[in-house]
Amino acid sequence: RRSGLKVECRVKGFADFGAVEWVLNFKNLSDANSATIEQVKVVDLNLTSPGEGGFTVHYADGSHVSKADFHQRTKVLAPGDSLYMAPEGGRSSQNAFPFFNIEAPDGRGAMVAVGWSGTWFADVAAGTKGGVALSAGQKNLSAYLYPSEAIRTPSVCLLFWQGENRFAGHNAFRRFILAHHTRKIDGKPARYPVSTSFNYGDPAPCNEYTCLTTDYAIALIRRYEQFDIVPEVFWLDAGWYEQAADYKNQKNWANTVGNWKVDRERFPDGLKPVADEVHRVGAKFMVWFEPERVVKGSQWAVEHPEWMVDVGADQYLFDLGNPEAREWMCDYIGDFIEQSGIDYYRQDFNMEPAWFWAKNDEPGRAGIREIRHIEGLYAFWDYLLE
């Protein structure tokens, strides 16, 4: 009996680096809800080696918001040992890192990358007779699909290497990313620019986030010009929007996101005059945004409550999984960037989305909210690059 469920694996190989990457897509072609899709392992394979000794996994912690962020870790897998990795809170590098190196005892190995800006998992388990089993995918998925509904999984990339030590793999993977997954400008990999902020420090509350004005920003730009130290980019950080400067009423940059209108008391003509001055001295202009998090009572929350994913907290998650909401966000931020003369878009995300997804999943459809949000996030970024 046919289930009506179509499973497609899109694969791309890179012969110049001995690498391969793929992603799975599921689509329900039937007229009824599909059976439950769960325990999906986008990669599920065994790695073996003729060498003596155990396999070693080189990995990193991810971010703990500490000085030890992305600390390097190494685990030698004895027979029966395993290493399970997964981020916390719904952000892909929170307490775990989706890139790691499996080193065999014979001078070979595989670099592994899991492409998913949500909650992924990866497991490396050593067998009792040698070799290791590798599996990875979306951590929380147990859902049926509606008729004609389709979803994608995380992607996986494997790069096989051979050399004296693990650094052969690290360096090969770095070159691979530069060659095939780095944005090109005039045929060359885009470089991170040397940038500076408009922050002039404390005493709080008068710092960039509350007291910066058009006049002060322009004066600061001219000061850099005077001393011939103009950077490649001037970076305007958080707090340029309405209510962020109202510290007398306990407002600040963090509890006013969702008010994506320029504070006209500090920037009476918007951000364009600042951008014009930045461009006059030969630099580019970068501006900070955090569109996924929306504080209750803010502009976006009031104007579009139907697009707010709610868990009863003091903030919402913007519903990027809603095509209408995503299209509106694309137009709003895209128009703002063009009208304000912004060259570089900087995106932040200061919340854990996992519980917003989980609490708003329909019964029997765990993981769908996460998938739709990540798909929408990628579509939004694609729009900005067009």
Provide a role label for each language-model segment.
Residues L24, S148, S195, F234, ...:
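Conserved, mostly hydrophobic/aromatic
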Residues S117, L158, F198-Y200, F234, ...:
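Active-site beta-loop-alpha junctions enriched in small/polar residues
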Residues A143-Q162:
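Short Pro-Gly-centered flexible turn/kink motifs
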Residues P154, R191-T196, E232-L236, F285-F289, ...:
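Hydrophobic faces of well-ordered beta-strands that scaffold small-molecule active sites
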Residues R166-V233, D237-E242:
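An acidic-aromatic substrate-binding cleft motif
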Residues I218-V233, A238-K284, P291-R293, S298-E303, ...:
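Catalytic cores of extracellular degradative/oxidative enzymes
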Residues D263-V281, G297-E386:
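Active-site neighborhood of glycoside hydrolase catalytic domains
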